[in-house]
């Protein structure tokens, strides 16, 4: 039997698999509870399974898709996990405590192909997509590390990679994470952030009710294309049309993320352009002062410019928050993930 990873299976797929090896379908629900409820480290811990079934699992089904290579913790409590993959690549995930919430930022790719100019991850280039198991296991491994001390309450696809460029694996991972017989995460507590791959954005709206965040960072095409090459393929008018058509539950809004770059996109004129761009969309805005990293040509704007930009949006009745950097001293802040080991 070719080895498989249990975390690659949705529950219906696992039910089909266990029936294929001669077991009854309810065994799949037992496995989900052991893997995601109890966090077992070995199939031998599953004492309610027959010895023969456990032997089959031990010889053909892997429990983990990745391993923790390194963990760093910042003074503010933010933790960065470096994970090793079986092919030698590595990725990072970040746990951000903000009581009573504890948010895990997960990666969806090794590297990223989009090449956003302000993002250190983009400088790595694209290596490969993650499997569903490699996405799910980031959640499992961090929760295993936390133990009974704390629970992950929110998951955000804002780590390494563009989630919509790996949508098949991301949707499969979300189905596993949200499965009531497993981790039972509410879709309301899962957020996916995208630079704006429009066809995949439309598919996401049809297939998964997770929260949507759009990385915007400029309100006019020329500047956005300079900062984010994806804008040349899907310019703002195309992206915003897709956002206007995106299916939103009552009282839900799309989050628009806007990194403030000193002297680039942070003046009052651009705030007005952003207000105009968001007209007619149920939107909220997260402003993020740039997190400096080695080799970057961009600078963090002054607090005065940040607050002035926020005020301009709030005066237009757009809910606007300033997201303060977390974990910057360990390279865990937004746009800083590079998965270096050493």
UniProtKB/Swiss-Prot annotation:
The gene is rlmN. Pfam families: Radical_SAM, RlmN_N. Binds 1 [4Fe-4S] cluster. The cluster is coordinated with 3 cysteines and an exchangeable S-adenosyl-L-methionine. This is Dual-specificity RNA methyltransferase RlmN. Its cofactor is [4Fe-4S] cluster. It is found in: Cytoplasm. [4Fe-4S] cluster binds at residues 112, 116, 119. Keywords: 4Fe-4S, Cytoplasm, Disulfide bond, Iron, Iron-sulfur, Metal-binding, Methyltransferase, rRNA processing, S-adenosyl-L-methionine, Transferase, tRNA processing. It catalyses: adenosine(2503) in 23S rRNA + 2 reduced [2Fe-2S]-[ferredoxin] + 2 S-adenosyl-L-methionine = 2-methyladenosine(2503) in 23S rRNA + 5'-deoxyadenosine + L-methionine + 2 oxidized [2Fe-2S]-[ferredoxin] + S-adenosyl-L-homocysteine; adenosine(37) in tRNA + 2 reduced [2Fe-2S]-[ferredoxin] + 2 S-adenosyl-L-methionine = 2-methyladenosine(37) in tRNA + 5'-deoxyadenosine + L-methionine + 2 oxidized [2Fe-2S]-[ferredoxin] + S-adenosyl-L-homocysteine. NCBIfam families: rRNA_mod_RlmN. It comes from the Bacteria. The active site is at 92 (proton acceptor), 334 (s-methylcysteine intermediate). Disulfide bonds join 105-334. Its main location: cytoplasm. Coiled coil: none annotated. Residues 98-329 form the Radical SAM core domain.
């Amino acid at each position: 039997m070719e080895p498989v990873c249990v975390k690659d299976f949705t529950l219906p797929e696992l039910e089909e698999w266990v029936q294929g090896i001669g077991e009854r379908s309810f065994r799949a629900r037992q496995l989900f509870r052991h893997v995601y409820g109890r966090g077992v480290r070995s199939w031998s811990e599953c004492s309610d399974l027959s010895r023969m079934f456990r032997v089959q699992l031990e010889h053909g089904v892997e429990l983990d898709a990745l391993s923790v290579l390194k963990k760093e913790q910042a003074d503010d409590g933010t933790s960065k996990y470096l994970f090793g993959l079986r092919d030698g690549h590595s990725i990072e995930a970040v746990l951000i405590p903000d009581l009573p919430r504890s948010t895990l930022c997960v990666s969806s790719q090794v590297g990223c192909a989009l090449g956003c100019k302000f993002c250190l991850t983009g400088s790595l280039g694209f290596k490969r997509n993650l499997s569903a198991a490699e996405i799910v296991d980031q959640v499992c491994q961090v929760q295993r590390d936390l133990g009974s001390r704390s629970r992950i309450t929110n998951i955000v696809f804002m780590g390494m990679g563009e989630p919509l460029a790996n949508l098949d694996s991301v949707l499969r991972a979300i189905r596993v994470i949200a499965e009531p017989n497993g981790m039972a995460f509410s879709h309301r507590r899962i957020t996916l952030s995208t630079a704006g791959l429009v066809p995949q954005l439309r598919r996401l709206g049809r297939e998964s009710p997770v929260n949507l965040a759009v990385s915007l960072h400029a309100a006019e095409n020329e500047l956005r294309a300079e900062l984010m090459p994806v804008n040349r393929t899907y310019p703002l008018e195309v992206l915003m049309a897709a956002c206007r058509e995106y299916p939103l539950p009552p009282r839900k809004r799309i989050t628009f993320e806007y990194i403030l770059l000193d002297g680039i996109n942070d003046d009052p004129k651009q705030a007005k352009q952003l207000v105009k761009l968001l007209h007619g969309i149920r939107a909220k805005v997260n402003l993020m002062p740039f997190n400096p990293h080695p080799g970057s040509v961009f600078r963090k704007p002054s607090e005065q410019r940040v607050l002035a930009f926020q005020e301009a949006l709030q005066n237009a009745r757009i809910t606007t928050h300033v997201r303060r950097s977390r974990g910057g001293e360990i390279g865990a802040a937004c746009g800083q993930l590079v998965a270096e080991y050493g």
